[in-house]
Amino acid sequence: MRFFPWGFWLLCVASAPARGDSGSKARSCAEVRQLYGAKGFSLNGVPQAEISGEHLRICPQGYTCCTSEMEENFANKSRSEFEAMMKEAGRSVQTILTAQYKSFDNYFQDLLNKSEKALYDTFPSLYGDLYTQNMKVFKDLYSELRRYYRGSNINLEEALNEFWTRLLERLFKLMNAQYHITDEYLDCMVKHAEQHKPFGEVPRDLKVKATRAFIVARSYAQGFLVGSDVVKKVSQVSLSHECTRAVMKLMYCPHCRGMASVKPCSNYCLNVVKGCLANQADLNTEWKYLMDALVAVADRIDGPYNVDTVIGTIHMRISEAISNLQENKVSITAKVFQGCGNPKVSMKGSSSEDKKRRGKVTLEAKSSAVALEMLVLDAKGNLTALKSYWVTLPGVLCSKKIMASPAEDDKCWNGMTKGSYLPEVMGGGLANQINNPEVEVDITKPDMTIRQQIMQLKIMTNRLGNANIGNDVDFQDASDDMSGSGSGDSCPDDVCVKRLSKSPSTRQPETHAIPKQSGHGVIGASSRSLPSAFLLFLSGASIVVQHLWR
């Protein structure tokens, strides 16, 4: 009986905070209801005023306007919205790279088309039968050049050698129509004639210049396509389970807490996004190498390899070669007859060499060097601007898409309440996320889709490096099928269920300007937790009091 007054007093003290808290008025959930409905969800079951938040699995468990279903729906929504942000950012880069590809491709194809058209327009009047009876040889040449540019596995030097051989055979036969020339005789003729350069220096000179020009042109065009394709595939990588939780907490938990107008802290947002885009940031090094390689090749295109002059004058070089053959016809024929013997005279009559063509006729080629210069300048500017895309992406998403608060703001959403955000900002890349306070990142398991794209960047950069020094490289079509990654499941249990290793309750006290929590909120929730604490205190105090009264 002596214990009763002490026990009664302690019970009164323990129950006092609870009675005081019950008198406070819960805040309205009107803002959250409006947002929830605007996102396309039904308002059935949505609280009118704050409720107890012990059921929450992602957001802090204080008073809340969100039910379990709302939290799950918001988690799904945050994931889809974040992935949409990534795709939108990626599309802007794809648009730039694709536009550069199309600009150069149109320019290059136009050069080739104009050269071919000039040949078709002028050669009939210049060479008569020498051209009209051998049109297919010229068409095949331009067809092979286009196929090479498009990435077909063609040896360009062999294709050019084949063209000159076929042209020599056809022209020699046509210029010596009075003779019966067999295929065996043509084989012998080619061996002897080539020793005496029937076309002059044109074949060798054109082979060197055209090969270099086509190598850099197709590598340059392909580089833009590969870059665009890499961005497209990386932008489609699904958000991980851990990131879905972190992004939900960043974007929608303040609404659940009744802080709809409070923006996320800038550094808090950066840590979330850097953790979620850790694998993407690892593209940075190879991405910069690709951009630099494209700039270097652009300088070659508008410089030493002079694509405009070489490609735009192919028809003129062919005309020059034919002129050389006509001028050297007598000596070349004599040397061939000497080495291969005199062919039999044909019953068809004398040579059908066209009388229209005597002497050299100068063909004109309209230069588009200014257009190429402007095209290259524009490309170099865009490539330089895109070099830092992957490292600046988190900042861009936070400032322009998520609309995070300025870094100096100390009244922003820090993941638990309104206040300052104290943790340092993590570096970019997978290895730097080992201590990320917002996202649990397994740095031992890199994303394989992104690793494959890093390899694609390396391969393309190597091709551009070879092209830059005039080396031909094997090519493959970069427009392979899109490969999706991940499923579209909505907030699985292992996403919404609290993680043991990095839940809100494991935050260090210095992380935010609030005390450490174990699933409880800050406003109102702390007072509701006091009875439990006092009852624990009561148990211990009772033992002490009983001991003192003995």
Swiss-Prot record:
Signal peptide span: 1-20
Post-translational modification: O-glycosylated with heparan sulfate.
Keyword check for Cytoplasm: no
GO-annotated cellular components: cell surface; endosome; extracellular region; plasma membrane; side of membrane; synapse
UniProt-annotated glycosylation sites, renumbered to this chain: 76, 113, 382, 483, 485, 487
InterPro entries, sorted: Glypican, Glypican_CS
Lipidation (GPI-anchor amidated glycine): 524
Location(s), subcellular: Cell membrane; Endosome
Organism in which the protein naturally occurs: Gallus gallus (Chicken)
Topology relative to the membrane: Lipid-anchor; GPI-anchor
Highest taxon in the source lineage: Eukaryota
Region listing for Disordered, in residue ranges: 475-494, 502-522
Gene that encodes it: GPC1
Family the entry assigns: Belongs to the glypican family.
Entry keyword Lipoprotein: yes
Function summary: Cell surface proteoglycan that bears heparan sulfate. Modulates Wnt-signaling pathway.
Biological processes annotated in GO: cell migration; negative regulation of fibroblast growth factor receptor signaling pathway; negative regulation of satellite cell differentiation; negative regulation of skeletal muscle satellite cell proliferation; positive regulation of skeletal muscle satellite cell differentiation; positive regulation of skeletal muscle satellite cell proliferation; regulation of protein localization to membrane
UniProt name for this protein: Glypican-1
Removed propeptide positions: 525-550
Keywords from the named record: Cell membrane, Disulfide bond, Endosome, Glycoprotein, GPI-anchor, Heparan sulfate, Lipoprotein, Membrane, Proteoglycan, Secreted, Signal
Pfam families assigned to the protein according to its UniProt record, in alphabetical order: Glypican
GO molecular function terms attached to this record: fibroblast growth factor binding
Low complexity bias spans: 481-494
Cysteines joined through disulfide linkages: 29-65, 59-253, 66-256, 188-340, 243-276, 265-412, 269-398
